[in-house]
């Protein structure tokens, strides 16, 4: 990646067979941000859960649809946008279950909300939803000369 690259976009079919590829890309993105190995794995888990939810809930297991993953590298944080073109979601209805009420397959939103620093649902596109996930780089945040939202250069 050269110093002018600040964004990576990946478009994949909504087929679970591509989740391994997406996990690899997300893991590498975390490493480029110098996150610890644990944080990289956690971010990867959050994105994997989000992708699974898109496939299952937005696309109703229709594997022919597209998901666009856009990764923005900033000095203070990593931003991951997952855009689907399926059934719109009402963000107010997306709530993690209490651990006492967990049943198989019911922890995705819980993991996403607990791993990521910010989780936002943008329902403004004509079709679908953009899930915006941010993970702050705590080692750079205190000493950053950039304001939140300014992009950094990657080596």
Regions found by a protein language model. Name each.
Residues 14, 35-38, 62:
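Structural signature of the histidine kinase catalytic ATP-binding subdomain
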Residues 9-21:
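STAS-typified acidic loop motif
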């Amino acid at each position: 990646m050269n110093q002018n690259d600040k964004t990576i976009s990946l478009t994949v079919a909504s087929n679970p067979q591509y989740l391994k590829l997406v996990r690899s890309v997300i893991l590498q993105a975390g490493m480029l941000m110098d996150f610890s190995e644990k944080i990289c794995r956690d971010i990867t888990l959050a994105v994997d859960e989000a992708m699974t939810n898109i496939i299952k809930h937005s696309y109703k297991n229709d594997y022919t649809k597209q998901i666009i993953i856009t990764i923005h590298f900033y000095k203070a944080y990593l931003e991951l946008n997952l855009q689907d073109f399926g059934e719109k979601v009402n963000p107010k209805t997306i709530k993690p279950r209490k651990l006492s009420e967990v049943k198989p397959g019911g922890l995705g939103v819980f993991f996403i909300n607990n791993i990521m620093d910010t989780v936002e649902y943008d329902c403004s596109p004509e079709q679908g939803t953009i899930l915006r996930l941010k993970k702050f780089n705590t080692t750079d945040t205190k000493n950053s000369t950039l304001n939140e939202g300014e992009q950094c250069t990657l080596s």
